[in-house]
């Protein structure tokens, strides 16, 4: 996942700007990039068991009003989560999380999250 973290930060910043949501990019264990939220509160922090369950399903997750947290100690809920899959293996996740009152995603936000996960997955194959 080290090769992904080199450009994940730039991708997170662009995605956050486009969606107006905070963005977290994780490997299987930790946050490796963040934008739209204080990085010191997120980087290198462990993923929550709730996020692990979402990622293990290998499917796109969109919040239906639940307030699940992605990172230990982060109180912003997950809006969209899309697993990063490379060569058939789950390698991480791209997340859109709540940001300054924005708590829902529109269809284009969801598509952008899916594209980000596919792009990052292809970069580490």
Model-based region annotation:
Residues 1-18, 47-52, 93, 97-125:
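Juxtadomain coupling helices with adjacent low-complexity linkers
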Residues 9-74:
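Structured interaction and signal-relay segments at domain junctions
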Residues 30, 89, 101-102:
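Generic "edge-of-domain/loop-turn" microfeature
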Residues 73-85:
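A short beta-strand signature within small-molecule sensing/ligand-binding domains used
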Residues 84-94:
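Short hydrophobic/glycine-rich mini-motifs in sensory/regulatory modules
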């Amino acid at each position: 996942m080290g090769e992904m973290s080199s450009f994940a930060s730039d991708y997170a910043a662009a995605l956050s700007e486009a969606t107006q949501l905070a963005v977290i990019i994780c490997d299987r264990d930790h946050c490796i990039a963040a934008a739209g939220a204080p990085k010191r509160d997120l980087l290198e922090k462990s993923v929550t068991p709730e996020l692990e369950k979402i990622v293990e399903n290998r499917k796109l997750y969109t919040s239906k009003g639940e307030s699940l947290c992605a990172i230990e100690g982060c109180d912003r809920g997950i809006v969209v989560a899309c697993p990063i899959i490379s060569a058939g293996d789950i390698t991480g996740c791209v997340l859109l999380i709540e940001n300054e009152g924005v708590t829902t995603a529109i269809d284009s936000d969801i598509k952008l999250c899916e594209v980000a996960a596919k792009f990052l997955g292809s970069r580490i194959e």
